[in-house]
Regions:
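Ribonuclease/tRNase effector modules and their secretory precursors
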Residues: 1-87
Length: 87
């Protein structure tokens, strides 16, 4: 399935990098394809979550548009905050 990024999502790469957080398109694609947790409570939006590093997870907000996945945004978060959220 092809993955497309919104303008906001593309800008997010450089915003996070300015804070010292490096995220790649490959990492995002991997989390979407094999998430540790997926939150479907905000359909049609999905939130896929996967490990970013030892302390943090990466949460990816996306929607399905036909055969394409559209990444809207993504953000790192502390594992300690999200491990309690068993969605």
């Amino acid at each position: 399935m092809p993955i497309r990024f919104t303008k906001h999502a593309l800008e997010k790469f450089s915003v996070l990098k300015s804070y010292g957080v490096s995220v790649s398109r490959t990492q995002i694609a991997q989390i979407i394809r094999t998430p540790e947790i997926i939150d479907c409570r905000r359909l049609p939006l999905y939130i896929a979550q996967g490990e970013l590093d030892k302390r943090r997870v990466l949460r990816v907000v996306y929607k399905q548009k036909g055969a394409t996945i559209v990444v809207i945004t993504f953000c790192p978060g502390l594992k300690s905050h999200y491990e309690k959220d068993n969605t």
